[in-house]
Amino acid sequence: MKSDVETLNPTRVKFTVEVGYDELKPSLDKAYKTIAGQVQVPGFRKGKVPPRVIDQRFGRAAVLEEAVNDALPKFYQQAVEASDFLPLGQPTVDVSQAPDPKDGGDLKFSVEVDVRPVLELPDLESIAVTVDDLQVPEEEVETRLTALRERFGTLTGVDRPAADGDFVSIDLRAEIDGEEIETAKGISYRIGQGNMIEGLDEALTGVAAEGSTTFTAPLAGGERKGQDASITVTVQSVKERVLPEADDDFAQLASEFDTLEELRADLLSQVEQSKKFEQGLQARDKVLEKLLETVEVPVPESLVEAEIHAHLERESRLEDAEHRAEIEDSTRQAIRSQLLLDALADREEIGVEQGELIEYLVGQAQQYGMEPQQFVQMVDGAGQVPSMVSEVRRRKALAVAMEKATVTDASGNPVDLEELVGGTEEDDVTEDATEDVTEDAAPAEEGQTVDPTGDDEQAAAEATAEDPAKS
């Protein structure tokens, strides 16, 4: 086999392949066996029809066509492996010459396919970004203390009109043109939640127990979803939450601390850690943004179109041109990020340990509210493990970039990102959960890595992957 590759543009190449007739013999033999198993010829058992009879009854051309169809993927893959390119998406094949049914001859074909672009990456130590100063507002400590007091608060009935933050028990009746559509009784609701019916909070404010009011709002569900209905709400009771005093007794009740001062100090530490984490996330986003500004990352249009199509199909909005335009920029930016981090991971020779993959899968399961084993089975069944491997690899590549980049705050002080790079709040998983997933994962020796190259990486590039800047 002879093959050449021509670069059409930074993200697309053309392979030209020539295969000698002798090299097609395994595929020809296979073609005869395939056809013999599909046809019935009098005097021969199924699958035992000799080649000469197949040629006589069905023609040599049919055999060659079957052989060429079998051989094309194999020789295309050999041409890819002989090159330095990683195909992305589906190839376009053109057979320019097929063997002659009588005289034989070579098979010649060409393949155009999108490929991962070759990027010129900078020295990571040349990357410098500035983030906001670390500020710990005292009011956030008070907010956390109030939230803790609310957890230990008690509900007490009040003889006054309902106000924001009160807890009410209500009955609801919805009507359209005098026809009762739906009713509900004894619903507990906190005024100000804003998660039930549009305008409900405003309608309830100022209404006392045993009082009622009527307002108009669109229905949130059912057969008449979106239609305006007349909503009558009757208040059965009004209660307010009485908070315990913030003192040493409360500190002992709500925490492991003996004094309110110790509890406040702990809440202050929590706020400080949260702000450090936010500062670290800002640094991560800015490092990636700086890399994208520095590196020219051409994007294969087929990937953009495939991702947009998949997104619209999931939302059943394939004909929504306006929404297509809305998501195109974000899709293109996400793919640029993926391609850049893939290239960076290659240069830094980053692999993925099985334990790292398991930890990531457990974290994702928690985000989706699923049991780790159930999530792993779902991901494996959908063939999405390779995309998960690539996502972990990209995260590690970005972590390397953050470690080597210079990050300072607005005051010029260096920012320590060790906690974020070494593991985030989202990465903390229980040992039991990790062990559960390990039982479903493929076994690996200590230190063994999951191969992020070849078919795995190609599948990952074609799959929907989250933007690493937002993970």
Swiss-Prot record:
PANTHER family, from UniProt?
Answer: TRIGGER FACTOR CHAPERONE AND PEPTIDYL-PROLYL CIS/TRANS ISOMERASE, TRIGGER FACTOR-LIKE PROTEIN TIG, CHLOROPLASTIC
Return the Acidic residues bias intervals: 416-443
Q: What sort of enzyme, by top EC class, is this?
A: isomerase
- In the UniProt entry, what is the domain comment? Consists of 3 domains; the N-terminus binds the ribosome, the middle domain has PPIase activity, while the C-terminus has intrinsic chaperone activity on its own.
Gene3D superfamilies attached to this UniProt entry: 3.10.50.40, Trigger factor ribosome-binding domain, Trigger factor, C-terminal domain
Protein function: Involved in protein export. Acts as a chaperone by maintaining the newly synthesized protein in an open conformation. Functions as a peptidyl-prolyl cis-trans isomerase.
Residue ranges of domain PPIase FKBP-type in the record: 165-244
Q: In its UniProt entry, what is this protein called?
A: Trigger factor
Question: Which family is it part of?
Answer: Belongs to the FKBP-type PPIase family. Tig subfamily.
Specify whether Translocase is a keyword of the entry.
no
Identify the species of origin: Kineococcus radiotolerans (strain ATCC BAA-149 / DSM 14245 / SRS30216)
Which reaction is this enzyme known to catalyze? Answer: [protein]-peptidylproline (omega=180) = [protein]-peptidylproline (omega=0)
Identify the InterPro entries for this entry. PPIase_dom_sf (IPR046357), PPIase_FKBP_dom (IPR001179), Trig_fac (IPR005215), Trigger_fac_C (IPR008880), Trigger_fac_C_sf (IPR037041), Trigger_fac_ribosome-bd_bac (IPR008881), Trigger_fac_ribosome-bd_sf (IPR036611), Trigger_fact/SurA_dom_sf (IPR027304)
Quick one: where is this thing mainly located? cytoplasm
The compartments listed are: Cytoplasm
- Which residues constitute the signal peptide according to the record? none
EC number(s) in its UniProt entry?
5.2.1.8
**Primary gene name:** tig
Region of interest called Disordered, as start-end residue ranges on this chain: 407-471
**Pfam families membership:** FKBP_C (PF00254), Trigger_C (PF05698), Trigger_N (PF05697)
User: What are the protein's UniProt keywords?
Assistant: Cell cycle, Cell division, Chaperone, Cytoplasm, Isomerase, Rotamase
